[in-house]
């Protein structure tokens, strides 16, 4: 953990807790010590990351999910996976919305994903107004009977005030049922790593 730049205090607390639990366990004859150790580490990692799974609150008609996150964190890919899962397991009729107006291939990527999973994609080629695109998509979803709208937005950094204002404006305009923040641990590592030294 330390080599992967996890905060020292977090890593120390985690390893101390794992050690304490491992030393305090009586190993059942049916369980190997290595299996017990894997379970303890898994349980502690789960607790460290929040511990509980929460269901999505998708009560609106259509229900709206706003995707947000850092640049390159996988929002577009996750949007497609989420649409496929909710379509298959929750019998939803999703519409994907391409609101990343900055990355040239973003609309194409979402369109290809939509075709692969047989989920339509709403886009407005040439438009540079993601707020209006999202509002128009919701209007179309209502008109065509889609019960789920997944809005894929551009990646951003907290230090980019214009982009932060944009995601705030989108959220205010569409009032989503859920806002999901997509994070990739390697991307976060890149953003938090110190700059290279000569």
What is the predicted role of each segment?
Residues 1-4, 191-198:
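Conserved small/polar residues in nucleotide/adenosyl-binding loops
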Residues 131-135, 189-190:
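Structural motif
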Residues 165-184:
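Inter-motif core of Ras-like GTPase G domains
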Residues 109-113, 166-169, 193:
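Alpha-helical scaffold elements adjacent to nucleotide-binding pockets in ATP/GTP-utilizing enzyme cores
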Residues 106-107, 159-164:
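Conserved ATPase-coupling elements of RecA-like P-loop NTPase cores
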Residues 3-99, 106-127, 134-153:
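Primarily NTPase-proximal linker/entry elements flanking Walker-type ATP/GTP-binding cores
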Residues 101-104, 127-128, 155-158, 185-189:
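Conserved nucleotide-binding/hydrolysis micro-motifs of P-loop NTPases
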């Amino acid at each position: 953990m330390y080599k992967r730049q996890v905060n020292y205090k977090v890593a120390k607390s985690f390893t101390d807790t794992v050690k304490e639990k491992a030393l305090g366990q009586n190993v059942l004859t049916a369980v190997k010590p290595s299996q017990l150790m894997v379970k303890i580490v898994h349980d502690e990692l789960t607790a460290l990351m929040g511990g509980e799974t929460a269901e999505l609150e998708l009560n609106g008609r259509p229900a709206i999910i706003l995707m947000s996150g850092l640049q390159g964190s996988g929002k577009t890919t996750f949007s497609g996976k989420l649409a496929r899962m909710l379509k298959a397991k929750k019998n939803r009729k999703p519409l994907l919305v391409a609101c990343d107006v900055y990355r040239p291939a973003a609309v194409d990527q979402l369109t290809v994903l939509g075709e692969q999973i047989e989920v339509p994609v709403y886009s407005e080629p040439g438009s540079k107004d993601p707020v209006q695109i999202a509002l128009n998509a919701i209007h179309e979803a209502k008109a065509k009977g889609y019960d789920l709208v997944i809005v894929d937005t551009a990646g951003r950094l907290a230090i980019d005030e214009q982009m932060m204002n944009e995601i705030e404006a989108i959220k205010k305009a569409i009032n989503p049922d859920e806002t999901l923040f997509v994070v990739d641990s390697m991307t976060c590592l890149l953003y938090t790593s110190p700059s290279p030294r000569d």
